[in-house]
UniProtKB/Swiss-Prot annotation:
<dbReference type="InterPro" id="IPR005225">
    <property type="entry name" value="Small_GTP-bd"/>
</dbReference>
<keyword id="KW-0648">Protein biosynthesis</keyword>
<keyword id="KW-0342">GTP-binding</keyword>
<keyword id="KW-0963">Cytoplasm</keyword>
<dbReference type="InterPro" id="IPR035649">
    <property type="entry name" value="EFG_V"/>
</dbReference>
<dbReference type="InterPro" id="IPR005517">
    <property type="entry name" value="Transl_elong_EFG/EF2_IV"/>
</dbReference>
<dbReference type="Pfam" id="PF00679">
    <property type="entry name" value="EFG_C"/>
</dbReference>
<dbReference type="InterPro" id="IPR047872">
    <property type="entry name" value="EFG_IV"/>
</dbReference>
<dbReference type="InterPro" id="IPR041095">
    <property type="entry name" value="EFG_II"/>
</dbReference>
<dbReference type="InterPro" id="IPR000640">
    <property type="entry name" value="EFG_V-like"/>
</dbReference>
<feature type="binding site">
    <location>
        <begin position="88"/>
        <end position="92"/>
    </location>
    <ligand>
        <name>GTP</name>
    </ligand>
</feature>
<comment type="function">
    <text>Catalyzes the GTP-dependent ribosomal translocation step during translation elongation. During this step, the ribosome changes from the pre-translocational (PRE) to the post-translocational (POST) state as the newly formed A-site-bound peptidyl-tRNA and P-site-bound deacylated tRNA move to the P and E sites, respectively. Catalyzes the coordinated movement of the two tRNA molecules, the mRNA and conformational changes in the ribosome.</text>
</comment>
<feature type="domain" description="tr-type G">
    <location>
        <begin position="8"/>
        <end position="290"/>
    </location>
</feature>
<dbReference type="GO" id="GO:0003746">
    <property type="term" value="F:translation elongation factor activity"/>
</dbReference>
<protein>
    <recommendedName>
        <fullName>Elongation factor G</fullName>
    </recommendedName>
</protein>
<dbReference type="GO" id="GO:0097216">
    <property type="term" value="F:guanosine tetraphosphate binding"/>
</dbReference>
<dbReference type="Pfam" id="PF00009">
    <property type="entry name" value="GTP_EFTU"/>
</dbReference>
């Protein structure tokens, strides 16, 4: 089967935003204008096409990033049909993992901001992730019809809060209830969308006289930004020549692809204005798969570099970026094809697990409707039904040309709770349900506490875990009791200790056991986790026993000597020891290493680390004192304050242990008028009194 849309006419984009900036409504309008869904779904009444899990409809927030395919030929039918694959991304901080995961497989992104709220805390997180994966982006300032809407303030926020380089592509005509349309600064025409057909048809009109001066000034900025793309254009521009519309667009596109500028558009998705022109900007300025650098990978040895270009002629390589459980067909594995072609029925290699997988059926998703297709090609995003052993971040590739595409990094959970099934019958179902959910979401972990025998679930925040428990009830019909949230503390050392000895010797008839190690232990910088350096000279410990030393230490890292919490940011150097020809074994060295580790750890100024959250509270000014006082009582460190759209914004760093139940406390302190967002910032030494209380509580169990 030949390719139906040339790969140059593909756009793989994410639409991403702060919660409530109107992203789902924006996506709905995109689907409506591209002719996919003929009735616009409103989030207000819980009928949006993209939000397909029951809970999302109830809470009105998007949880799973559904992938949808749509076609667009321009609002004036000025393009050949372009295939736009949209990945809807959640805006709530507890689901940042979903955003990270989708950023990994996008080529470009549309950042949706609220014209009233501007750039909010979650937008910064999403922005950082887009920077990390070098995703070119444009911005859409939504909700221009709302009281307090201000387009240019939002543009300013992109510069000051996100350190981006925004260049408006449009200027709004009126705002709040007088929002009429936009001025296209490239064409210097006003766009007026028809209300009769929900904005499908439109007219170009002259720029309103009262906005002409402002529009000309903004167009100059836009043309200057375009001229900076090349020396030839700059010469032409400085020589007083007009740049053609074609030249301006081409130059702006180049600068967006290089991540040098952010083009900003505006509108009101709810009022059917502006989304159409934003879609044109997606085609004009965001990259096709062929505009993006080849994707890097490694050969199966894990060391030799390899890469794949966006071409049907290269060997098949794809990345699984999401697993979803579907009530009718079981597991759906969403994947992005980077190169090559695969047909349903083909066998491929999961190179991360080194297992064969067979593509049974392949479906293209439209939110929660699916169309079965026979093949997928480079640039496509689709879902496979019936893959057995694929988890998020795995590579699927041609068996004859294996490659491992870079793995995604997933954050460690910061909060855990114990869950117990309400009845014996729920016990088995709960294990199955949690296993399924953990396969879908790598930032969610499940384990059994060895001491208490309880099942522990851990995730990125209270809301994250609420939703997991809720999904167990709805999708798997498992009723569970939930314990009190527990903080994920960590342990580390602050000093270096040298020549710590660990000796395990048992000689009591028959074959004995003998292992003897001498190690140094030292702190590592934050985020380095663990390193093991083998400095054995002259074979005082034979090579085959060295992995045993590493294993012994790794096992101890899972449960530190201080209070049994995982150990992080610590290095070990093995530099001396001894062995016995007959009695030494890997196990003996493993035991010796763990003895040395325990002894050394307690001498190296051990500390308990607690997770610190970045908290941002938006509050009316009247309650500012109460909010700050409360954050101080919670051991918060106030970082700064600034004006927000509806009062003041307070930024603080607060230990997670002090933030439980904060939502309720904030509501009652401000009569429900303040809101807050929080995300994990870092681990930090817990104060002595806190650390002692935590350690004593652990020991009393």
């Amino acid at each position: 089967m030949a390719r139906t849309t040339p790969i140059e006419r593909y756009r793989n984009i994410g639409i991403s935003a702060h919660i409530d900036a109107g992203k789902t409504t924006t996506t709905e309008r995109v689907l409506f204008y591209t002719g996919v869904s003929h009735k616009i779904g409103e989030v207000h009444d819980g009928a949006a096409t993209m939000d397909w899990m029951e809970q999302e409809q109830e809470r009105g927030i998007t949880i799973t990033s559904a992938a949808t395919t749509a076609f667009w030929s321009g609002m004036g039918k000025q393009f050949q049909p372009h295939r736009i694959n949209i990945i809807d991304t959640p805006g709530h901080v507890d689901f940042t993992i979903e955003v990270e995961r989708s950023m990994r497989v996008l080529d470009g992104a549309v950042m949706v901001y609220c014209a009233v709220g501007g750039v909010q805390p979650q937008s910064e997180t999403v922005w950082r992730q887009a920077n990390k994966y070098k995703v070119p982006r444009i911005a859409f300032v939504n909700k221009m019809d709302r009281t307090g809407a201000n387009f240019l303030r939002c543009v300013e926020h992109i510069k000051t809060r996100l350190k981006g380089n925004p260049v408006p592509l449009q200027l709004n005509i009126g705002s709040e209830e007088n929002f009429k349309g936009v001025i296209d600064l490239v064409k210097m025409k006003a766009i007026n969308w028809s209300e009769a057909d929900q904005g499908v048809s439109f007219d170009y009109e002259d720029v309103p006289a009262e906005l002409l001066e402002k529009a000309q000034e903004m167009r100059m900025t836009l043309v200057e930004a375009a001229a900076e793309a090349s020396e030839d254009l700059m010469e032409k521009y400085l020589g007083g020549e007009e740049l053609t519309e074609e030249e301006i667009k081409k130059a702006l596109r180049q600068r967006v692809l290089n991540n040098e500028i952010i083009l900003v558009t505006c509108g009101s998705a709810f009022k059917n204005k502006g989304v159409q022109a934003m879609l044109d900007a997606v085609v004009d300025y965001l990259p096709a798969p062929t505009d993006v650098a080849a994707i890097d990978g490694l050969k199966l040895d894990g060391e030799t570099k390899d890469e794949r270009h966006a071409s049907d002629d290269e060997p098949f390589a794809a990345l699984a970026f999401k697993i979803a459980t579907d009530p009718f067909v079981g597991n759906l594995t969403f994947f992005r094809v980077y190169s090559g072609v695969v047909n349903s029925g083909d066998s491929v290699l999961n190179s991360v697990k080194e297992k064969r997988e067979r593509f049974g059926r392949i479906v293209q998703m439209h939110a929660n409707k699916r169309e079965e297709i026979k093949e997928v090609r480079a640039g496509d995003i689709a879902a496979a039904i019936g893959l057995k052993d694929v988890t998020t971040g795995d590579t699927l590739c041609d068996e004859k040309a294996p490659i491992i595409l870079e793995r995604m990094e997933f954050p460690e959970p910061v909060i855990s709770i114990a869950v117990e099934p309400k009845t014996k019958a729920d016990q088995e179902k709960m294990g199955l349900a949690l296993g399924r959910l953990a396969q879908e979401d790598p930032s969610f972990r499940v384990w059994t506490d060895e001491e208490s025998g309880q099942t522990i679930i851990a995730g990125m925040g209270e809301l994250h875990l609420d939703i997991i428990v809720d999904r167990m009830r709805r999708e798997f019909k498992v009723e569970a009791n939930v314990g009190k949230p527990q903080v994920a503390y960590r342990e580390t050392i602050r000093n270096t200790v040298k020549d710590i000895e660990g000796k395990h010797a048992k000689q009591s008839g028959g074959r004995g056991q003998y292992g003897h190690v001498v190690i140094d232990m030292y702190p590592l910088e934050e985020g380095k986790a663990y390193e093991f350096v083998n400095d054995i000279k002259g074979g005082v410990i034979p090579g085959e026993f060295i992995p045993g030393v590493d294993k012994g230490i790794r096992e101890q890292l899972k449960s530190g000597p201080l209070a049994g919490y995982p150990v992080m940011d610590l290095g070990v150097r093995l530099h001396f020891g001894s062995y016995h020809d007959v009695d030494s074994s890997e196990l003996a060295f493993k035991i010796a290493a763990s003895m040395a580790f325990k002894a050394g750890f307690m001498k190296a100024n051990p500390v308990l680390l607690e997770p610190i959250m970045k908290v941002e509270v938006e509050t009316p000014e009247d309650y500012m004192g109460d909010v700050i006082g409360d954050l101080n009582r919670r051991r918060g460190l106030i970082e700064g304050m600034e004006d927000g759209p509806s009062g003041k914004i307070v930024r603080a760093l607060v230990p997670l242990a002090e933030m439980f139940g904060y939502a309720t406390a904030l509501r009652s302190a401000t009569q429900g008028r303040a809101s807050y967002a929080m995300e994990f910032a870092k681990y930090h030494d817990a104060p002595t009194n806190v650390a002692q209380a935590v350690i004593e509580e652990r020991k009393s169990k």
